[in-house]
A protein has these predicted regions:
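N-terminal helical capping/dimerization or prosegment-like subdomains
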Residues: 1-84, 257-261, 278
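Metal-dependent amide/peptide-bond hydrolase catalytic core
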Residues: 3, 50, 186-389
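A structural signal for isolated positions on well-ordered beta-strands in alpha/beta enzyme cores
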Residues: 45, 73, 134-136, 300
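Acidic, glycine-rich active-site loops and adjacent beta-strand->loop/helix elements
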Residues: 52, 78-79, 101, 136-145, ...
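Active-site metal-coordination/substrate-binding segment of hydrolases
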Residues: 69-134
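Acidic-glycine-rich active-site phosphate/pyrophosphate-binding loop
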Residues: 83-98, 162, 177-189, 351
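Short, conserved micro-motifs enriched in small and acidic residues
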Residues: 102-114, 142, 203-206, 367-374
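Acidic/histidine-rich catalytic neighborhood of metal-dependent amide-processing enzymes
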Residues: 110-184, 388-389
């Protein structure tokens, strides 16, 4: 079989060697990306998080005439999920090649994609581009598409107005046009502790947490049975789940605190803001009832993470461009979420297309097949031709 270029393999190895687990800083990797870009004459801009421990990186390879507006975004996230508790056959932060596969944390999701881009920088620079190529690398995708929000805002602020975007999440180089939104919430009920033999002197926070969780399950059932639905998804309806509940300190103590974590993933036709408001209103009613019983009680409703879904029309130019670059056409929609919806919501029609199989992402002994890297290289080569004058 054809092997990936030595440039791609070298860049992928360098990226994997940097542990960018979401809980930690990604700045060493941003330093590396920045240096690689500077080495070929490309300026970039960092967009930091609030405490400057992490950063996005945005760079533009201008068209041959110097234009920076329009063109295409190549987007990828720099963080990876933890390896804690996983049984790996080799060091997860050192690339190992076995059986025509590369093993290591992030090989599939999604440092191989970024590595291919870095390996192709000389070709990007030497091409006589008729349209610019924008490189957008984010932080904290794995914990809720956090960094991409300010990254997309920066693209809008610079008035780059890209005509389309490719998000290189592992799709086996299939052109994915749709996925659901992602919405994660934490609802905290604060009651009053008391001895369990004197319940009237306390206010049971778990009781209110359970009532709230039951309401969420009722809505989940409603969405599952009444729709709307989209048969392109394995799970054709909007899904909603209570996934974590914490509360109480002892069996003989009325619990003063209970926290309910829930999430929903909605179809594009569902108004996610209206759905959130409906649930929040019920939580607020419970909070008012608690305060009426005891003024010390309270309720807080917090959205922890969220990103819009993706539903790119097949007639969009970016879909045709993906096909011309060798992406495999796909009519199904994927269950996982990506940053693609943020780019699309900002006016850039977006396709998810990258090397690797999502089934290998996040797993112990994460890997990517070498032929997937080769396919991604071919995609980039054809993209250069398509965008050249």
């Amino acid at each position: 079989m054809t092997r990936p270029s030595s440039a791609s393999l070298r860049e992928i190895s360098d990226l994997i060697a940097l542990d960018t687990t979401s809980r930690d800083t990604n700045l060493p990797l941003i330093d590396l990306l920045e240096a690689k870009l500077q080495a070929v004459g490309i300026d970039s801009k960092r967009i930091y998080n609030e405490d400057r421990s992490k950063a996005n990186l945005l760079a533009t390879i201008p068209a041959d005439d110097g234009s920076r507006r329009g063109g295409v975004v190549l987007s990828g996230h720099t963080d990876v999920v933890p390896v804690d508790g996983q049984n790996w056959s080799s060091d997860p932060f050192t690339v190992h090649e076995r059986d025509e596969k590369l093993y290591g944390r992030g090989t599939c999701d999604m440092k191989s994609y970024i590595g291919v881009i870095l390996g192709k920088l000389p070709e990007f620079i030497s091409a006589k581009l008729s349209q610019p190529i924008h490189l957008a690398f984010s932080y904290d995708e794995e914990i809720g598409c956090v960094g991409a929000v300010s990254l997309v805002d920066e693209i809008v602020s610079q008035e780059l107005a890209p005509r389309g975007c490719f998000v290189g999440e592992p799709s086996s180089m299939r052109a994915i046009r749709g996925h659901k939104s992602m919405n994660v919430f934490k609802v905290s009920f604060h009651g009053v502790a008391a001895h369990s033999s004197l319940p009237s002197e306390g206010l049971n926070a778990i009781s209110y947490g359970l009532r709230f969780a039951s309401f969420v399950e009722e809505i989940a059932h409603e969405l599952r049975t009444e729709g709307p639905s989209d048969p392109a998804f394995i799970e054709p309806t909007t899904t909603m789940n209570v996934n974590l509940i914490n509360g109480g300190i002892a069996v003989n103590t009325i619990p003063s605190d209970c926290t309910v974590h829930f999430e929903f993933r909605s179809l594009a036709v569902v108004d996610r803001e209206a759905l959130t408001t409906r649930i929040k209103n019920f939580a607020s009613q419970l909070g008012e009832e608690m305060r009426a019983r005891n003024p010390q009680a309270s309720m807080t409703f917090e959205q922890v993470a969220g990103a819009p879904g993706l539903d790119t029309d097949p007639s969009e130019e970016i879909v045709d461009l993906a096909a011309r670059c060798g992406a495999i056409a796909a009519d199904d929609k994927v269950t996982y979420g990506t940053e693609a919806g943020l780019f699309a919501a900002a006016g850039s029609p977006t396709v998810v297309c990258g090397p690797g199989d999502i089934a290998q992402a996040h797993a112990p002994d994460e890997f990517i097949e070498l032929e997937q890297i080769v396919a991604c290289e071919g995609f980039m080569d054809q993209l250069i031709k398509e965008l050249s004058s």
